Design a protein with these regions (language model features):
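Charge-rich, low-complexity N-terminal segments
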Residues: 1-139
């Protein structure tokens, strides 16, 4: 049975779920925690994958694209107007997704990025919006 290892990465971001009937329709923010689980045989150092490599590769992508920005659904007119103001002020760009930026959609997005960047089998990504609420993506 292969080993699994999980690394937690954290970031702060705003988002809005435009079709939500409740408070998530209003732009707001979270302190996200992302648990990335990889599986495989132990390498010569005794790791599936060095936790530092996960942080260096996937953490750097998260820092560049998601941390301290606003994540929105492409076509959301309110958020696209806010993103244009953000660009005009030369601030960090907003991050546009094809789907509503829910924890579920972020888990799928980050899973795909992790698969491209990490030198191990990615088996699951779990995104925590709050300490009590999370969503996972696994193939």
């Amino acid at each position: 049975m292969p080993h699994e290892a999980t690394r937690r990465l954290e970031f702060d971001a705003g988002h809005r779920v435009p079709e939500h009937g409740g408070k998530c329709r209003t732009p707001h923010g979270h302190r996200y925690a992302v648990d990335v689980t990889v599986r495989g045989p132990l390498g010569r150092e005794g790791f599936v994958l060095d936790f530092g490599e996960i942080k260096a590769k996937l953490g750097a992508w998260i820092d560049e694209h998601l941390d301290h920005t606003t994540i929105y659904q492409r076509g959301d007119s309110l958020m696209e107007a806010m993103a244009a103001l953000n660009r005009a002020a030369k601030l960090k760009p907003y991050y546009a997704m094809d789907a509503a930026p829910t924890a579920e959609a972020l888990a799928e997005l980050i899973f795909g990025v992790a698969q491209r960047l990490l030198d191990a089998e990615v088996v699951r990504v779990n995104v925590h919006e709050t300490p009590n609420c999370s969503a996972a993506w696994a193939p």
